[in-house]
C-alpha cells in the first residue's frame, strides 16, 4: 500500500494538529449525526515537481495568504488574496496536481487558521523541515463541506539520508458559504512581456512618482511608463514571423507584444501596491507579462502575471488618459530599450467579430453552487 493511499492508518492515529479553539480536532472518520460517514467529494495532491511549481508561485506571496480565499472546483484551485489592497490570484489547473479528483459545485474555504498561520503555510519555504506532499481532501455536501489539509514532512536532511518516519500536520476547515468573487472573463487587448531588468526600470519610474503613473502605447508602437520622476520607453519595431523566429535564438533585449495596436493610455493613481507586488513577483521570475484591458475606455485596467507553470496574477484599476499627452523619453536615453514586437494582432478581434462596445469584464462566483451542467463556468487557466 502506498504511503498516500486511502489507508493512512498509522499517520491518522497520531496526527499533529493545529491547536486552536476554532479548529476541529479530529482523530477518526468524519460522520454525520446519524452515524453515516461523510463522502469524500474532492482530493487534490501536490508532490514532486507539481509541489515545487506551486511553491514557486505561492512562496513569494506567502506572508499575505493567511486570510486568502481558497476556491476548489472542477477547474482546479484558485487562491484569491489581497496585497496592499490589490487583488491577487494564484491558479492551479487540474493537470498541475499530482492527483486531482473533484465532484460537485465549487467550494470556498478561508485560509486562516490562527493569528499567525494558514492552510497554505505548507507551501512556504521551511529550512527546518522538508514538506514532500500536500493533500487537500473535501468531505460532505454543499453548503456544509469540510476541508482536510495534510502536509507530510520530514526534518531537513532526513529524506536525503534515507527513508524515515514522516510526520503529518493536519488542518480542518469548514466551508465558507457567504462570498462573491469577481473573476475576469475575457482576453486582454494588449499583452507585453518584460524582462526582469525592464521591470526594474518600470518600478524605478513608479517609485519616484509624486502623483500617478501612466502606461501608454503610442501609435508608433512605443510602450512607455511615465510619472513625475521620469519616463521609460520601450520602442517596438513591427516584424514578420520570420524575423521573430530568427530573433528567438538570440538574447532578447526588448518587449514582446501581442494584441491590438490601437494607441491607449491609462493612469494608475497610486503605485504603492504595484511596487510591493512587483518586488514579490520578480522573485524567481525572469519575466512578467503586463496585460492591458483598454475597453470600456472609461474604466481601463491592467494585470501583471508571472510566466511560470503556476501563475500568479494581480489587477490594477486605472483612470483613462490621453496618449497624445504622454511625454517621450529623451533621444538616446539610457532607459530606452530597443524592442521586437510580434507582427499581427493575435488577440485582436477577427474580421466580422461583433463584440459589444462594453464587454462584460467579470464573471462572478457567488455563494450558490454552479449548475451541474457547468454552464457559465470557466477554466482558471483561460481567465489568467
Curated annotation (Swiss-Prot):
Which is one Gene Ontology cellular component term of this protein? host cell nucleus
A Gene Ontology molecular function term for this protein is:
DNA binding
Instruction: Output one GO BP term.
Output: DNA replication
InterPro entries xref list? DNA_clamp_sf, Herpes_UL42
Subcellular location(s): the record lists: Host nucleus
Entry-linked Pfam families: Herpes_UL42 (PF02282)
Main localization of the protein? host cell
Keywords of this entry: DNA replication, DNA-binding, Host nucleus
- Family the entry assigns: Belongs to the herpesviridae DNA polymerase processivity factor family.
Q: What the protein does?
A: Plays an essential role in viral DNA replication by acting as the polymerase accessory subunit. Associates with the viral polymerase to increase its processivity and forms high-affinity direct interactions with DNA. Facilitates the origin-binding protein loading onto DNA thus increasing its ability to assemble into a functional complex capable of unwinding duplex DNA.
Its assembly, as annotated, is: Interacts with the DNA polymerase catalytic subunit. Interacts with the origin-binding protein.
Q: What is this protein called?
A: DNA polymerase processivity factor
Q: Which organism is it from?
A: Suid herpesvirus 1 (strain Kaplan) (SuHV-1)
Amino acid at each position: 500500500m502506498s504511503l498516500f493511499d486511502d489507508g493512512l492508518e498509522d499517520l491518522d492515529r497520531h496526527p499533529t494538529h493545529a491547536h486552536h479553539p476554532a479548529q476541529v480536532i479530529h482523530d477518526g472518520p468524519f460522520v454525520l449525526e446519524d452515524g453515516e460517514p461523510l463522502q469524500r467529494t474532492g482530493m487534490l495532491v501536490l508532490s514532486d515537481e507539481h509541489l515545487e511549481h506551486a511553491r514557486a508561485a505561492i512562496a513569494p506571496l506567502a506572508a499575505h495568504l493567511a486570510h486568502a480565499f481558497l476556491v476548489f472546483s472542477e477547474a482546479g484551485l484558485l487562491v484569491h488574496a489581497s496585497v496592499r489592497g490589490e487583488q491577487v490570484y494564484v491558479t492551479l489547473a487540474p493537470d498541475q496536481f499530482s492527483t486531482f479528483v473533484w465532484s460537485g459545485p465549487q467550494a470556498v474555504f478561508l485560509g486562516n487558521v490562527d493569528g499567525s498561520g494558514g492552510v497554505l503555510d505548507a507551501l512556504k519555504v521551511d529550512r527546518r523541515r522538508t514538506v514532500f506532499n500536500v493533500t487537500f481532501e473535501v468531505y460532505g455536501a454543499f453548503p456544509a463541506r469540510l476541508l482536510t489539509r495534510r502536509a507530510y514532512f520530514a526534518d531537513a536532511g532526513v529524506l536525503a539520508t534515507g527513508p524515515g518516519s514522516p510526520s503529518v500536520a493536519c488542518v480542518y476547515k469548514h466551508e465558507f458559504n457567504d462570498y462573491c468573487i469577481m473573476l475576469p472573463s475575457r482576453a486582454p487587448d494588449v499583452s507585453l512581456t518584460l524582462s526582469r531588468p525592464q521591470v526594474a526600470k518600470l518600478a524605478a519610474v513608479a517609485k519616484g512618482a509624486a502623483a500617478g503613473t501612466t502606461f501608454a502605447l503610442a501609435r508608433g508602437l512605443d510602450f512607455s511608463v511615465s510619472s513625475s520622476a521620469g519616463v521609460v520607453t520601450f520602442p517596438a519595431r513591427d516584424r514578420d514571423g520570420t524575423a521573430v523566429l530568427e530573433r528567438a535564438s538570440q538574447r532578447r533585449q526588448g518587449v514582446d507584444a501581442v494584441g491590438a495596436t490601437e494607441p491607449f493610455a491609462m493612469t494608475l493613481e497610486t503605485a504603492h501596491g504595484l511596487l510591493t507586488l512587483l518586488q514579490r513577483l520578480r522573485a524567481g521570475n525572469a519575466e512578467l507579462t503586463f496585460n492591458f484591458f483598454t475597453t470600456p475606455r472609461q474604466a481601463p485596467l491592467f494585470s501583471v502575471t508571472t510566466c511560470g507553470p503556476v501563475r500568479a496574477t494581480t489587477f490594477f484599476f486605472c483612470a483613462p488618459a490621453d496618449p497624445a499627452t504622454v511625454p517621450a523619453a529623451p533621444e538616446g536615453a539610457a532607459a530606452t530599450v530597443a524592442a521586437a514586437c510580434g507582427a499581427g494582432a493575435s488577440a485582436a478581434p477577427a474580421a466580422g467579430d461583433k463584440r459589444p462596445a462594453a464587454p462584460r469584464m467579470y464573471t462572478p462566483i457567488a455563494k450558490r453552487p454552479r449548475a451541474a451542467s457547468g454552464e457559465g463556468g470557466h477554466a482558471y487557466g483561460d481567465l489568467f
